[in-house]
Amino acid sequence: MCSSDLQNKSYKDYIMGTGYDMVEKTAEWAAPITGIPAERIKQLAADIAAAEAPFICQGWGPQRHTNGEDTSRAICMLPVLIGKIGLPGTNTGQREAEPPTYLVGSLPFENPIKTAIPVYQWINAVDHGKEMTATNAGIVGADKLNNDIKFLWNYAGNCITNQHGDINYTHDVLADESKLEFILVWDTVMTDSAKYADILLPDAMRSEQLNMQTQGYSEYYTAVVVGGPAQEAPGECRSSYDVCADIADKFGKKDAFTEGKTQEDWIKELYEAGAKADGNMPTWDEIKAQGVYKRTLEPAIGLVDFRTDPVKNPLSTPSGKIEIYSEQLAEIAATWELEEGDVINPIPVFTPGFQGYGSVTDEYPLYCTGFHHKSRTHSSFGFIPELEQVARQQLWINPADAESRGIASGDTVAVKSPAGEIRIEALVTPRIIPGTIGIPQGAWHKADMNGDRVDEGACVNTLTTYRPTPLAKGNGPAHSIIAQITKA
């Protein structure tokens, strides 16, 4: 949807080479970029165009590159361009066709602070927060930050270091205690992030307290699980609700915080509100006894209501329609302050991004990508030695790249990037293409930060850059690293 002059601005112009860079986006053009033969690209295009119900779906990997925002949008264009949306068997191009369906809601709490930052930008808000604005850092709810972050509360997470880009940069910022003055970490295990805490509080695990979990991301069913405690919390471990209630009591605000309710009272209230809306859920006493309630859902078809009646069922875009050309993005591109190489465009375009495969150098000739490991959920369970034994933390390297470096499976190798260095066991395999290496994300960082900083734990974020993506200001570098490998 475009109200401005469309000359040389349409998606068709970009694809056909009659606008923008005047380069026709043929299969031959795409082949060296993708590493896929032109004939195979043409066959895929023909198959998509001929399919009665093409189900086009992307995971969350493509967006986690420095050029991933445009890649993600381009994938969503495929079903749009052939008109195969809102029909049985089709999809929107996203991973989830529809929002998740939860049987139970959350606490009725509204944050009185409306100013917010992209979560990936938190360390910059510590280092130079007052320089961050809506146009250079994606600040929302205000034109700029008026203060640097001075206090950090990290609950049940490992993103101070381990799960955040460029660990060495983060460490250097945190080492200056005139910047971030106080760190509170509240967790069940001693993560690398927990090592930076001024105060470390031991939390009760979910299995050590009454808890409720919801499952809503499946297309075919939704569920709620109530249970616990399976065992008593050891030592001084306590639930966060009870601790916060005691803190509120010290300020004379316990009644305002708890509203006279225990943790179970709140969980019961939330459950019963969901049960009332659902109409078929068990009573509170019944769900506590049976533990799980699962309900089958009708299969969702993405954008089916919009296709049926686009006037009655407009989308949440400014125009209410599918926007191949975005006036909103055009305005952002014209007004935001972008780093050299950053691209925001009103249509999806190909851009190599920064530290992409086209950025390799003689010093860093390999492209490195992260991926999820089967023994961990991000960094959760990364401290369990039995899991490490059966599913080792290994770098994937193609035989051609390994042979030229004298590397065999089982060798310990040094991996260097502009951001840092790790040690990791090599796995030589043809399952990864030449010129590219893969490192499972989530391994626990283990380095002498007062010494050589070489990470013996092989955390991929020792190698990543901190620079965020152009639009969302998010974690694009997770799969965009340039590196070199040598036998250690």
Regions found by a protein language model. Give the residues of each.
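Long, well-ordered, tryptophan-enriched scaffold segments
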Residues: 4-51
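Extended redox/cofactor-interaction regions of prokaryotic respiratory oxidoreductases
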Residues: 77-196, 204-212, 230, 288, ...
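Long, contiguous, secondary-structure-rich segments that constitute the structural scaffold
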Residues: 238-290, 379-381, 385-396, 400-488
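Catalytic or ion-translocation cores adjacent to nucleophile or general acid/base/metal-coordination motifs
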Residues: 204-229, 236, 434-436
